[in-house]
A protein has these predicted regions:
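Sec-exported extracytoplasmic/periplasmic mature domains
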Residues: 6-10
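Extracellular glycan-associated modules
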Residues: 16-217
Length: 217
């Protein structure tokens, strides 16, 4: 039976076998795919949910987020979200403040800006910096720091369901709003930049991303 299996494998071009597992599903930056060599991602709404395999791989990594928006008076809503009610993160404007909600498996660590988001054309941002086991989040309005929060832990695998721009698709990541909570202003562009880190941390994050993508197959 074993010999027959190998004969059939050769006949139907199954060989060579590849047992690399999650490595095959990890992020491989290149010029002809969704993951550029410079690790920069730009999104121009309106767009549908971005699959995990194509979205910015922020799980387990340090990253910068900048949203270029035009905000009418009193407009709220989600700018970027990834995950579900079980885990993930959401960046949104609520009650004139920029809010970052990090949903760590049902435990919400929230940062709010120390000053209101201005009306009209402006930028709002988030800097996420991981350490070995914890992380720090800094909120920015027009490039100026406006609040921060220490996270005692961070998730290496952020989401297996992808990301949403301008709304929160699926079950809400944050418990501070219901439904998709779409942003009522104009999102001109969202930029996410993956910050370089040591090879060990990068491999850990890449393997976690691979497991997330593999789980969706």
């Amino acid at each position: 039976m074993i010999a027959l299996w190998w004969d059939e494998a050769r006949q139907y071009n199954v060989l060579p076998l590849d047992d690399r597992g999650v490595t095959l599903f990890g992020i491989r930056p290149g010029d002809h795919g969704p993951h550029r060599l410079d690790r920069n991602y730009s999104y121009f709404p309106p767009i549908t949910r971005i699959p995990t395999a194509a979205s910015a791989p922020i799980g387990g990594r340090s990253w910068d987020f900048v949203a270029h928006i035009v905000r009418p008076a009193g407009s709220d809503g989600v700018l970027y979200a990834t995950g579900t009610e079980n885990s993930g993160l959401s960046i949104f404007i609520q009650n004139d403040l920029l809010v970052f909600d990090y949903n760590y498996f049902g435990e919400h660590w929230v940062a709010e800006s120390t000053r209101p988001v201005p009306e009209g054309l402006c930028t709002v941002g988030v800097q996420f910096r991981r350490a070995k086991r914890d992380a720090t989040v800094t909120l920015l309005i027009n490039g100026e720091p406006s609040g921060d929060r220490h996270l005692p832990r961070f998730m290496r695998m952020m989401s297996s369901v992808g990301a949403s721009v301008g709304f929160d698709d699926g079950s809400p990541v944050s418990d501070r709003y219901t439904g998709p909570f779409p942003f009522c202003g104009l999102i001109k562009r969202i930029d996410i930049r993956i910050v370089s880190q040591d090879k060990t941390s990068e491999q850990e994050a890449n393997d976690a991303t691979g497991r997330s993508i593999q789980a969706r197959q």
